[in-house]
Amino acid sequence: EYDKLTYGMLYNYGEDFMLSLNHDDFRDKAFVDMVSGSDEKAHLSDIKAALGFMYAHPGSKMFAAGQDAGLEKFMSELNKFYAKNAALYELDNDPDGFMWLENSNPEETVIAMQRADSKGNKLVIAVNFTPVRRENYRLHVDVRGKYKEVFNSDWKKFGGDEKVNGQIIKSDNDGDDMEYIDITLPGLSFVIYNSEPY
């Protein structure tokens, strides 16, 4: 199942496609009825993680109207963030706009990527598809610099448990000429960091 999340990038630049969650996909069900989780909060967290992956992945997006029940504030903020950050869409059809940072961790079910725009602005997106909180998750990054959390699907204002974190994380070197940051990934969530090179 993990490989299905990464498979699309194998043909992303050879075909035009749309990432779609429409009425045909739901078969008259609500999105929340089609995901796992023991309660409504877990259901909504699951959906937010999936939407985070969808919005971070290259390609046009289509989301069926009325499927955002319980997520109106979250979807409004996510759409605004997407529109304001060209790194998430400008180079959808250009390999320079995308880089995998983590696409081989099925054990922890974490996926991470970097998106970039034509001006060199870069965002790091990490998605945790399990309910397990990952503390000090080591994520290798492309840019040596400072990282700041700019979006977190688990923020309290979205019904989650996290406070807005304005802390700056400085990348470090692992000795093999690879930069990394240690981040916290709440369960069933996605986080976005912007980067500022040293």
Annotate each predicted stretch with a short phrase.
Residues 75-78:
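Short amphipathic alpha-helical coiled-coil/interface segments
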Residues 145-175:
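Trp/Gly-enriched beta-strand surface patches
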Residues 164-198:
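C-terminal beta-strand-rich structural cap/linker in extracellular carbohydrate-active enzymes
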